[in-house]
């Protein structure tokens, strides 16, 4: 289902805890997980150039890269990886983005802060692509 490209978009995703099966989901083993009330948020808009600017407010860090060079430059290069995955799914991006990321989810506390940010990022990209799509939760 195609939709119109928003000028500005805010996406929010909850963190989670594992009640049973921590670190087993990627092995295909059973997990009982539960969303928590703390959320990660991406607030962003399109740019007129091909630069991606990600302000990580909670960390006091800003990350920059060009859509023309999505080669991984560090371990866990999640934002480039997210764009690469979306491109493999057929999405295209002719312009970059300016985003601010904030999170209530504690880092390195077993509450899936990185996962929540990546789910928000993929959702944001799917809606801001040249031909936006509405993916269901399972697809994202």
Task: Report residues per predicted region.
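ATP-binding N-lobe of GHMP and related small-molecule kinases
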Residues: 1-115, 119-137
């Amino acid at each position: 289902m195609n939709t119109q490209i928003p000028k500005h978009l805010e996406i929010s995703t909850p963190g989670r805890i594992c009640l049973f099966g921590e670190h087993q989901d990627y092995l295909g083993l059973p997990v009982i997980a539960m969303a928590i009330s703390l959320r990660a948020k991406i607030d962003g808009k399109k740019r007129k150039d091909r630069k991606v600017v990600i302000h990580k407010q909670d960390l006091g860090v800003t990350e920059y890269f060009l859509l023309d060079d999505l080669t991984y430059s560090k371990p866990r290069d999640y934002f480039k990886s997210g764009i690469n995955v979306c491109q493999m799914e057929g999405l295209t991006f002719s312009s970059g983005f300016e985003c601010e990321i904030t999170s209530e989810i504690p880092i390195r506390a077993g509450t899936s802060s990185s996962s929540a940010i990546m789910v928000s990022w993929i959702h944001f990209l799917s809606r801001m692509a040249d031909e936006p799509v509405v993916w269901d939760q399972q697809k994202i």
